[in-house]
Amino acid sequence: MSRYDDLFARLDTAGEGAFVPFIMLSDPSPEEAFQIISTAIEAGADALELGVPFSDPVADGPTVAESHLRALDGGATVDSALEQIKRVRAAYPEVPIGMLIYGNVPFTRGLDRFYQEFAEAGADSILLPDVPVREGAPFSAAAAAAGIDPIYIAPANASEKTLEGVSAASKGYIYAISRDGVTGTERESSTDGLSAVVDNIKKFDGAPILLGFGISSPQHVADAIAAGASGAITGSAITKIIASHCEGEHPNPSTIRDMDGLKKDLTEFISAMKAATKKV
């Protein structure tokens, strides 16, 4: 069984959903990002979605786009991301590690090399947000060869054909979005019709469903679980907390001015989000 299989089986037995934070690697530096990741896990995060910084993050709203920029200002590279994943994997051998990476990275490195490198570093899954499932066959094949779970996005208003394709191609979990647009709490998740979104995906008997985009409060998490999702992913709300503790102006590197304060704020937020995954 994969780490995702183990996680979802354990949570199902416990009557809980998964809470998965998105955290940008190297934001604002590798060492500080590792402390942030460790804090998230210790606060109750069930799995991780880690971002690799990119200069043109088209699927991300302003908050997460700024985290890409902070990481790049600090000198982040794909190679440094791989080293950070190795460190996280060594520290947390059982925690599923998902990656969010833009599609030019595998093209630049070569598909087979790309997936093999991330598998060897300790990643469990990779989501390429700018690669739709209809273009995913070569990525899925390279992922399978490396032992990586490919993840695809199930858009809120997708056709049945698209949802069937996403369900067939996604391994580990399915990333379902609660509304159209880019990531971020600039537009919060709408819980209207959420059960229908989840039910439409479940018809195709795919991997567990994690709901993302605009998930910023415990109520959003509770609504996702009540709608039948297996968990929720939160990115922009966490990134905002990190940004509120950063100092520095682009293009100069940033730093965390109060790591203890950041850890406290993250722990309070993540603990509340995780508590909301309890099924009633």
Curated annotation (Swiss-Prot):
The lineage of its organism: Bacteria, Bacillati, Actinomycetota, Actinomycetes, Mycobacteriales. The keyword Lyase applies. HAMAP family: Trp_synth_alpha (MF_00131). It comes from Corynebacterium glutamicum (strain ATCC 13032 / DSM 20300 / JCM 1318 / BCRC 11384 / CCUG 27702 / LMG 3730 / NBRC 12168 / NCIMB 10025 / NRRL B-2784 / 534). NCBIfam families: trpA. It catalyses: (1S,2R)-1-C-(indol-3-yl)glycerol 3-phosphate + L-serine = D-glyceraldehyde 3-phosphate + L-tryptophan + H2O. GO terms for molecular function: tryptophan synthase activity. Its EC number is 4.2.1.20. The gene is trpA. Belongs to the TrpA family. Pathway: Amino-acid biosynthesis; L-tryptophan biosynthesis; L-tryptophan from chorismate: step 5/5. Tetramer of two alpha and two beta chains. Pfam families: Trp_syntA. InterPro entries: Aldolase_TIM, RibuloseP-bd_barrel, Trp_synthase_alpha_AS, Trp_synthase_suA. The active site is at E49 (proton acceptor), D60 (proton acceptor). It comes from the Bacteria. PROSITE patterns: TRP_SYNTHASE_ALPHA. The alpha subunit is responsible for the aldol cleavage of indoleglycerol phosphate to indole and glyceraldehyde 3-phosphate. Gene3D superfamilies: Aldolase class I. One of its GO terms (cellular component) is cytosol. This is Tryptophan synthase alpha chain. SUPFAM superfamilies: Ribulose-phoshate binding barrel. Keywords: Amino-acid biosynthesis, Aromatic amino acid biosynthesis, Lyase, Tryptophan biosynthesis.
